Amino acid sequence: MHTSHVLPRAALPVALGLLLASGHAGAQSNPSVATAPAPLSPAELSALVQQQALQIQQLEARLRAVEGGAVPLASAPAAATSAAPAALEQRVVAVEKAQSKAPKVSWSKGAPEFTSADGETVFRPRGRLFVDQSSTSGSDYGTRNLSGTEIRSVRLGAEGRYGIIGYAVEGDFADNAVAWKSVYATVDHTLFGQAADLTIGNRLNDRGLDGSSSTSNTPFQDRNVVGTLVMPQRGLFGVGLTERVYGKGWHASLSVAGNDLNNSGSDNDSLTWATRVHWNPVLSKDATVHLAAWAFHEEIPGGATGVLRSSAISGHFNDEIKIAPGTLVGTDRSNAWGVEAAGFFGPFWTSGEWGTRNLRGLDANGRYDLDHDAWSVGAGWFVAGAVPAYTAKAGTWGKVKVAEPVTSGGKGAFELKARYEDVDYAELPTGGTGNAWTLGGNWYLNDYSRVMLDVVRWKTDNRSGAYVGPDEGTTFNTRLQLVF
């Protein structure tokens, strides 16, 4: 409270002494000067002293800032203010020059991000933790009415950059196993005058709004059925090359990849060509419209597993509640495509996706040509504290920014959400059908953590597996999520 008074008082006698001494020395060293400068009036002298004191005070504050000092000016010895402004300026410049060469550290993403002084080298650890609880009731099969907890995902890794070369390495501990996820390098460049990057390695598919987004950012605990079922035999990831080009409100990608990094190496890889394009016809602070389409073609080796996938329609924990696709042997290729639409209007969002996959192969009955499809629609409303997060660069869900985090004394952000999704395997020889309504809410504690509730009302009608025929029930899923 007294900082602004101590320095002027300390500087006053110093400045007066310097002025008088310089005036006296000047008079003695220049006796031949006919006209001496007019003496300063008391008011002018006082103004000059105050100006000098203010300059010293500003330099001291600047020096404390760059040195990180915390000693209040009032507690410092008065003699510390007697240094001449020029000497103090030199000291500040020297400290600032040394500090400019030191690496910078930012915590804006929840973990320390280290950046070299020239900005060319960046490194930060990254990871996530999903702790889930699930409870199901209402099924006609008692073995489907399960309750329990699981650590859905513990993911640890790092990402960084050396100039135009970026990288990410990440492993996931889930389902009592360890699996590699993102393991790739990128090279930034330009293509047709637009920003672009080439990915080499194991990276998440660019396929659908939910399918292209991390589950750390999707509004629901699990991706919709288009993202989880209408996919290549290799799954969500694949080792290969992906070229992406970015424009204002659009992007396009083309990739070619084999199986993901966790392939056992005991058989041939599948080979998948894929593309996706998104466009934002409306892109502003108050409203954004997302339109997109995607497609892939894959060549599947003989004896490959995982060509068809069961839909965990009630959430990840309960493995008994799935829509069974049945058995299909001899598939040697597939083609798939889908469309997306979404809108973000202030605190509201809505989205819809549809996808279909055509399977071709040879079984005991000869050649076949069969389809299966899925679709989903959803909507949400941020009641308070934030707005929907969307990344226009890649056409994906983004990370929600909380205005008043709980960790800073605020209330966080609250979101209400609803989704309907439908799966149809009926054209396959023994494929089932099913659908689900999901209602819930998310409480965002800060930019890095949230508590989620999904209440799923599901129906299945399987023609194969342990639970044949119509069945329905309700599943309550909760999650504590931490991502950095």
Question: PLM ranges: what are they?
Answer:
Residues 2-12:
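Bacterial N-terminal signal peptides that target proteins for export
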Residues 2-4, 40, 142, 187, ...:
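Outer-membrane beta-barrel pore domains
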